[in-house]
Curated annotation (Swiss-Prot), chain A:
Compositional bias annotation for Basic and acidic residues: 1-13
Protein name: Exosome complex component RRP46
GO biological process per UniProt: defense response to virus; DNA deamination; mRNA catabolic process; nuclear mRNA surveillance; poly(A)-dependent snoRNA 3'-end processing; RNA catabolic process; RNA processing; rRNA catabolic process
Organism (species): Homo sapiens
Illness: Cerebellar ataxia, brain abnormalities, and cardiac conduction defects: An autosomal recessive disorder characterized by global developmental delay, impaired intellectual development and speech delay that are observed in most patients. Disease manifestations are variable and include infantile-onset hypotonia, poor motor development, poor feeding and overall growth, and ataxic gait due to cerebellar ataxia. Additional variable features are dysarthria, nystagmus, variable ocular anomalies, spasticity, hyperreflexia, and non-specific dysmorphic features.
This protein's UniProt keywords: Cytoplasm, Disease variant, DNA-binding, Exosome, Intellectual disability, Nucleus, Phosphoprotein, rRNA processing
Name of the gene encoding the protein in the UniProt record: EXOSC5
Pfam families: RNase_PH, RNase_PH_C
Tissue expression from the record: Highly expressed in a variety of hematopoietic and epithelial tumor cell lines, but not in normal hematopoietic tissues or other normal tissue, with the exception of testis.
Family per record: Belongs to the RNase PH family.
Disordered, as annotated region: 1-24
Amino acid sequence: MEEETHTDAKIRAENGTGSSPRGPGCSLRHFACEQNLLSRPDGSASFLQGDTSVLAGVYGPAEVKVSKEIFNKATLEVILRPKIGLPGVAEKSRERLIRNTCEAVVLGTLHPRTSITVVLQVVSDAGSLLACCLNAACMALVDAGVPMRALFCGVACALDSDGTLVLDPTSKQEKEARAVLTFALDSVERKLLMSSTKGLYSDTELQQCLAAAQAASQHVFRFYRESLQRRYSKS
Amino acid sequence: MAAGFKTVEPLEYYRRFLKENCRPDGRELGEFRTTTVNIGSISTADGSALVKLGNTTVICGVKAEFAAPSTDAPDKGYVVPNVDLPPLCSSRFRSGPPGEEAQVASQFIADVIENSQIIQKEDLCISPGKLVWVLYCDLICLDYDGNILDACTFALLAALKNVQLPEVTINEETALAEVNLKKKSYLNIRTHPVATSFAVFDDTLLIVDPTGEEEHLATGTLTIVMDEEGKLCCLHKPETGTSFSFF
């Protein structure tokens, strides 16, 4: 019964205000998601944000090594492979961030003494990479059917030298920015699950960025919902 | 009897203390452990510092060497941090290549140096395009009792303030560098970033400077690095059993 269960769910999210240059405020780049594209992993997803693309695969719940097993919950592992070269310390740090975000939402206690592995491959990097990785990981976990208490999404924002906020920055905008902040938000109450920042900023700017990210996450969650509805609907 | 209860139900034991707004070691929720700093203890290093935050001990040694700058930044030196968590400091670490925690801590320190601009990389330039200083900062944890990131940031800052670089001139005839060990000068430290770590308990309580046990029992941790002007250099919220709202 190995039929082609290749359900493409290519949805275009509504664009912000037209193409580049994006104005300050809340326009995210155009994004797309495709699920169930790999045959080996239990779940897989490819998430595109503008030109940034990440492919995620999830294996689990599966057998775990005795040294790594936790008696009352699932052991979550994240492997992030960069586009070029061998994974380094920066990848390890990002893996830790993604893993902790996933651990906060995955109901690990339903599958004790098992392992859930999320493998992320960077296909192209054009800014907001960590946010794209988080989105791809979430979609892949949903595709694998791993029980979760909420969905999560990643939103990146950049602050340039005069304090203007740009959501979902491109790599050029990230390079020129004074600070780049990435947040992971959950779908139930838009609470902050993880944050990772680069650069100097004041605490009022932090609050502004967080508020903008929470507003933007509405779009991302709506996109997830539409994408999944399209995939599972009969028509 | 209290010791028995602590072994069987560590979280409940802890909650009893938190209800009274204090912790088992007698500290308040917002109180830091006694901090001791010892500067310049390693004579063979160009700069060193030993920091003790309660029981957590981190030593930082800085060695300066020559290097050729990269072609896209010919007037910038390098600062290379490395955090080592040897089996000496805690039974949870094994000998061998650096584990995940050490790599994450190294990346964190590298981010703090980069974001807070603690040293202007141009200050480390000797001769643009030919010779620059590279500062290898090795942070070794001697005793792990929680809050390693704060201790490392502090040790790094103290050691960098202690670094003395000799004067270097390039001899035009031989094109070799001449080091004058008698004339040494301190580094120009532009900002003083300070890291503060918090542990989150049951989504509601925030305690400062968690010990090893507290980190293990907490539902999440959060580290904020600020400089003197009150600007945040880093907001590191990696671990969380659950989420919390900011406002």
